[in-house]
Amino acid sequence: MTFYNYTIDKGRLKKLIALAYRRYGSARCSQLADELKELGFRFATKAGVSISVDDLTIPPEKKQMLEAAEKEIRTTEERYARGEITEVERFQKVIDTWNGTSEELKDQVVVNFRKTDPLNSVYMMAFSGARGNMSQVRQLVGMRGLMADPQGEIIDLPIKTNFREGLTVTEYVISSYGARKGLVDTALRTADSGYLTRRLVDVSQDVIVREQDCGTERSLRVTAMTDGDQVKISLADRLFGRLLAKDVVGPDGEIIAKRNDEIDEALANRIAAVTDEVYVRSPLTCEAARSVCQNCYGWSLAHGHKVDLGEAVGIIAAQSIGEPGTQLTMRTFHTGGVFTGEVARQEKAPEDGTVKWGKGLSTRKVRTRHGEDAEQVEIAGDLIWKGEGKKAATQTYSLTPGSLLFVQDGQTVTAGQLMTEISLSKTQRSTERATKDVAGDLAGEVLFDRLVPEEKTDRQGNTTRIAQRGGLVWILSGEVYNLPPGAEPVVKNDEQVEVGSIMAETKLVTNDGGVVRLVSNREIEIITASVLLDQAQVKLESSGGREQYVIYTADKQRFLLKAAPGTKVQNHSIVAELIDDRYRTTTGGMIRYAGVEVAKGGRKQGYEVTKGGTLLWIPEETHEINKDISLLIVEDGQYVEAGTEVVKDIFCQSSGIVEVVQKNDILREIIIKPGDFYQDVDPGSVKIESGQLLQPGQDVFPGVTVSTLSQAEWIESPEGNGLLLRPVEEYKVFDEPAAPSQGSQNEEGGRQIELRSVQRLFYKDGDRVKSVEGAPLLSTQLVLEIYGSGNEGISHLSADIELQDDEEEDCQRLQLVILESLVLRRDQESDPLGGASKTRLLVQDGDQIPPGAVVARTEIQCKEAGTVRGIKEGQESIRRVLLERAADRLVVDLPSAPEVKPGQLLVAGQELVPGVKLEESGKVLEINGKGDNYQLVLRRARPYRVSPGAVLHIEDGDLVQRGDNLVLLVFERAKTGDIVQGLPRIEELLEARKPKEACVLARAPGVCQVEYLEDESVDIKVVEDDGTVSEYPLLPGQNAMVTDGQRIDVGHALTDGYNNPHEILDVFFSYYVDKDGCYQAALRGLQAAQKFLVNEVQTVYQSQGVDISDKHIEVIVRQMTAKVRIDDGGDTTMLPGELVELRQVEQVNEAMGITGSAPARYTPVLLGITKASLNTDSFISAASFQETTRVLTEAAIEGKSDWLRGLKENVIIGRLIPAGTGFSSHEEVLGLIETQDDIQGYMIEPIELPTTKKKASATKVKTKKVEADDDLLDDTRARAYAGTQLSQDDEEFEETYDTDEDDFDMDDDDDFGDDED
């Protein structure tokens, strides 16, 4: 090996091991690693390296750096307090300042270690690659830096200390946010990463190297992967381990490398030196059926030689992409465009000198994100700096569009002055709109200064007030009182008030009036209407273990109280019910009305009787059975005595004729109709209808006279027909119920309340009551009725039930009252925002008051003396009042008259008279004095800068409390690439999900026309090559990424936002399909989508510092882009909507072309990895992945066969897998390999291994030199050795290798000696 005269740090160590591995194979590489380990341990032990607290040396410059940063931030805070910059600009400046300081300090830490203590153990540890890296060491000896809060917003208070100095309590709390987030993320990450790996393995498990060369002419164009100025992956790195698809020709025409040459590191560097782009073989362009060929895959990175046949490259690819998943952060903090390192490069003046602008440089004035004025470059040009003196040096900076200039043409600059920020990226940075709330720091009165508000109405009709022109919002200090609802101020503007004087008062008013009842000191009840049953007593009785209230009336009637005392009763509810058995029947039966009339409706509560009469009741006994007909013991029409068993275990209670109701052999009911039964009566001789009522004394037929009221019914019985005379019972119903009704006593506000007694029937005319025991037919009830005056709604009213003690008769009476309850405000000594309040009661218990009377008054008192301000005239309700106190004024003594006028607004730091600066901002009230003794009286105030377009939450003259939101600042910030990052982004790409805000792509090449309209929107048109003009509408918030007159290609992004891979595929396909036909267009579209996916996945991994070879991603992407969707089957057997492999369709279409039939038309599709797994040819593999039932059902219905081509299917079935050693047996079965008879297996003879004592003579082999200078044999050398042998004849093999036993002198002191060594 070569001698390297370097300090071997982490990066070099990696390279060294890689080199040894590639050149000398795994066994010797691991031996080298072991020896390096031994070496390290030996010297570490000798040196006694350890890390102690003393090794954490903090750079002495830290103090000055922090002081400088704090000074800069103080200046920024002062500018903010003076209203020169907005809250957003202040925040941005603070963040950037601390960030810069933290970075500088980190660099200083390294410089400090190198200069003062290069053998410092912390420094050695970090740079040797043992443990830790710079970002961790900087927390130990630099500063911990800025942290994000749980919402991902950066806290503008940095952690200035490091772990060596120790954190303050505040810093510790801030620091723990991020720490917790890290732990939680790690826990969530492992699961996501595992699932991603599983999906990847599933989609690519059947990709196996099955052939040597597919012979494709297609190739992949490879260039270095860049981002702005940074090279993410160099061309040499991307070429390494691939095979060329086209010859590489140098600038002078010489061929550097030919097609199908393998590119090793040296060749990669040579190629990268002469060209920027190379065409290589790639799995994406491989035409091998269902696999990848050796030449397209290239080297197996495991051993740095061409991949073997039968290698399961799919699984290797899946594992390679899935494994680093845990290292990717779930979501990096959404930092709000903070880290400016990537966006712009700052150029400072090297020494004192002057600057000049180059020719053609055109700029426009802008305000930077720190609120400074600068010039933004629109047309690129140069900035020239020239030092002082005759032989002064000059330096030229080329400025790209978008760069910021902080110096004017011809200005003199001092050393270290910031001259320009050069924008790095070629394209314009995409920006997004963000908002930030600004809250007031003090209470007071709002005053707009040079601020022009305008109202905007959106489509929903909501109005927002927006600052059309930026300006200042001032808050003039004062104490603001929040008035409670309904309070009215009793003071006027400019009135002087003292402590405790009344500022406002609220009145508590009754709506209905009535009798006052004081319940507690917080609540007043007013009885608006009441009713008392003064003739009746209420007693508590217990019956059947339950206590109930019973009302005894003067007529000795007993009513059961249905509502408990203390509860509310709604209008029309039943309060009590008469206890009465007169209307209760003994059995079931049928009811008929005779002269009784009822009111309409009211089925729920019963039917109210409006006119009295008689109820006729025809008894019958009904048993509901619902059992099998076989259990019936009696017959239909049979006469039974009381106590007869009619059905098993059911006995009848009365004698009579049986009627059986049955349906579908189920016995539903048995009805027993009591009465006198006359058999063998001839219907012809008797003039009586069935159902006719017979009066007492009426003759039925000779010998039979009716004694009571009866009903006749003809019956068919088993013994013959007969006449049944059924008894009829009569119940008398009165017109009016016997119970008393009672009206209300006091009726304030025209309300009346009444207890009305009503009679209600439970059944209507003709109802049958199915029962054995009997049922009540009529009930007398007391019902609550509330009447309102006029048209006021009373449906919502309810009454309270109360029991009143009667002193004289020692019993309780029932009273119903309608109450209005009023709650008094609590007295407050001092509410922080509302002032002290006192409540006075203006009524006594028992007072009778009219509606609208004032019951109580609450007074709000001043806490301090002052002048009243801020009451707006003509406003309906006044919610806030301002008091200007002595503390809100500021008096400044001046030696001479200041040049200010009353009413003028002054900001802090303003010079009043020479030598006197104002300490606080304020509004001039008055100027007093003469000669050299002047007094300036100010009202303290605070300005807030508002940028144009901000949303105003306040109006001029409003009163605000401290902490109220004043405005919502709307600002643009550079979109940071870290919004979706890490695993979620990888998943989004591999699952081919559509991004939330996709960019607009050009559908054809042409020249852009970009027009910026009045309302800040952008209009983009593209004049295509054939002259058509296409318009591309932009969504709100999208920014144009092209400039006017720019030439663009198909698929170029016109706006910012993420690319949608589906759209890329669609745009390319639809553009090329008419030109080149389906197949070529599909290839072009898929190729564009493939290139995008590979690069995007690489970008994510690179941003996390993970190196993955392109070929792994390509294998996965190949699986995602293999299929097309059939649009029209033509004359083929394929169905529309079917997903088929592109190669397969093309073969069928070629055949169709030969026979002249119609080919199939199709659209290429991009499938996410889950979809692709479920759409494989193998249903066993798909079913074992997800949706097992669905996949298997469909496979069964379609009669699919599984050819067991992948690994998974074979594992599930339990066969040898078709990879590795199982590859050849499978391929012969499938007929993919022609068996070669000329190659027989060779027995590998032992290699001559010269011992260390003898001089190793190089063994000569005609083809390839195999050096066997030690006894370490590994896979690489065995492969090389086998390779040399297969090309020799047997004799040569035997001649060249002298297999003499003496040479194997193993027990000598070889490298693997005994322990004593």
UniProtKB/Swiss-Prot annotation:
It comes from the Bacteria. Binds 1 Zn(2+) ion per subunit. GO terms for molecular function: DNA binding; DNA-directed RNA polymerase activity; zinc ion binding. Its EC number is 2.7.7.6. The keyword Zinc applies. Residues 1288-1317 have a biased composition (Acidic residues). Zn(2+) binds at residues 214, 286, 293, 296. Residues 1279-1317 are annotated as: Disordered. Signal peptide: none annotated. One of its GO terms (cellular component) is DNA-directed RNA polymerase complex. Its cofactor is Zn(2+). The keyword Iron-sulfur does not apply. Keywords: DNA-directed RNA polymerase, Metal-binding, Nucleotidyltransferase, Transcription, Transferase, Zinc. PANTHER family: DNA-DIRECTED RNA POLYMERASE, DNA-DIRECTED RNA POLYMERASE SUBUNIT BETA. Belongs to the RNA polymerase beta' chain family. RpoC2 subfamily. This is DNA-directed RNA polymerase subunit beta'. It comes from Synechocystis sp. (strain ATCC 27184 / PCC 6803 / Kazusa). The gene is rpoC2.
